[in-house]
Amino acid sequence: MDQEKENKTAEFYERLKAELDRSNSWPAEYLFKFIVPSIADNVERVESAFDCMGAVIKTTKSKTGKFTSVSVDVQMKDAQEIIDKYIEVSVIEGIVSL
């Protein structure tokens, strides 16, 4: 990853953390939403990122079946835990975080 992209990513997460801290009292319920290509083990990889957290996970395939929407409702202890989770799943090929 080039330096400019790394800087933009870091700035994005800093802004997200500030916004989450402004709008929540911790711990708080947080709804993660992802779109992943419906190939290999993408959905399972997202689900496993939230193992043992008491998450409620809902998946919906697109009309064509090429993509799957994954919604994860889970109690998070603070904004940094949310950001860490986004970073953890960002390595899944083709994932889009909403």
List each language-model region with its residue ranges.
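Long, contiguous binding/interaction regions
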Residues: 1-69, 75-98
